[in-house]
């Protein structure tokens, strides 16, 4: 069994803003660096968005309107917890990897945000490679892009 990867950051905004910014994934996700469109077509995706509810979908839209399913929302508890079954444009696997994001108040203007990705075994023979790839990618995505979006 492969260990989960966990990243913890502190963002300069309140808990509600931290959660809402994360949920507005299209406003901060660097589609020119990490997307199914870049991997498959060599183009920047048009958008990525999520339906904000349990069972909602996280979908990337390409420049020509093709949709890639990134995952399915499991938990959508505003200001506290967001989780999704995640496979980012790969053919859906069941079970998928799991991304959980927890939001904890530090004070009125700061929030601790912890992102954990687990269940690597869902990727079968590619599990170790996927874990290694995402381990590096979350630094750019979460620690840089998301944190910068929270700072405004």
What label would you give each PLM region?
Residues 11-13, 52, 75:
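Conserved strand-loop elements at the edges of beta-sheets that form or border functional pockets
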Residues 38-41, 46, 147-152:
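Short, highly charged C-terminal tails/helix-capping segments
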Residues 49, 59-110, 118:
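Hydrophobic-ligand binding "helix-grip"
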Residues 1-44:
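Hydrophobic ligand-binding cavity/cleft-lining segments
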Residues 18-22, 58, 73, 84, ...:
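Hydrophobic pocket/interface hotspot
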Residues 118-152:
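A conserved amphipathic terminal alpha-helix motif
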């Amino acid at each position: 069994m492969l260990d989960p990867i966990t990243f913890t950051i502190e963002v300069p905004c309140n808990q509600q803003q931290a959660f809402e910014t994360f949920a507005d994934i299209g406003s901060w996700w660097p589609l020119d660096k990490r997307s199914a469109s870049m991997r498959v077509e060599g183009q920047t995706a048009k958008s990525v968005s999520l339906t904000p509810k349990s069972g909602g979908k996280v979908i990337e839209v390409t420049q020509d309107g093709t949709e890639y399913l990134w995952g399915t929302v499991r938990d959508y508890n505003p200001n506290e917890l967001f989780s999704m079954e995640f496979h980012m444009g790969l053919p859906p696997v069941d079970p998928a990897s799991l991304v959980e994001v927890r939001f904890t108040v530090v004070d009125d203007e700061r929030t601790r945000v912890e992102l954990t990705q687990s269940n690597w075994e869902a990727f079968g023979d590619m599990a170790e490679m996927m874990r290694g790839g995402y381990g590096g990618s979350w630094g750019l995505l979460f620690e840089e892009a998301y944190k910068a979006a929270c700072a405004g």
